[in-house]
Amino acid sequence: MLHFNQFVILSAELSHLTPQENEIRTNQLQLMLTKLGFKPTEMIGRYKGDQETSFFVPTTRNDDIERLEFIAFDRFNQESILVQYSDGHSRLHYPNYIEHIGKVREITRQEAFKRDAYTFYPKLGKYYAAI
């Protein structure tokens, strides 16, 4: 995951929806990302203590980030997306502001479970969080 310089992590899920509703939204997001030419990788995320399916999306251009913001905020009503820029620094992008949160780094499972937010890559069995 970290061999990409710039990437976005986003989800379509909302904590107040049913698992079935969130599954539909997740499938819609994956299809939308693929049709737009992105190569999303499915992850398991935790945000504000709630587990959700999220997507790791490598980006090469800043207008890719803007497109992903539009999808997340306008189509799926997301609170934020995580963006790691090519300088290695990560930020949470909200509709009206940006919060600097450090750098995304690999962490242990034990460290992950102590956090309110992390990303798990099932294929590699690795956990990541902004530190």
Model-predicted segments: where are they?
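N-terminal, charge-rich interaction modules
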Residues: 1-41, 50, 128-131
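Short, surface-exposed beta-edge/turn micro-motifs
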Residues: 4-7, 51-55, 77-80
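Short, flexible beta-strand-to-coil junctions
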Residues: 11-17, 60-62, 84-89
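Glycine-rich loops and low-complexity Gly/Arg-rich segments
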Residues: 33-36, 82-83, 105-109
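Short, intrinsically disordered low-complexity segments
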Residues: 35-71, 75
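Short, compact, well-ordered microdomains
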Residues: 66-95
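Short, low-order "capping/linker" segments at domain edges
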Residues: 91-115
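C-terminal low-complexity, charged extensions that often adopt amphipathic alpha-helices
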Residues: 110-131
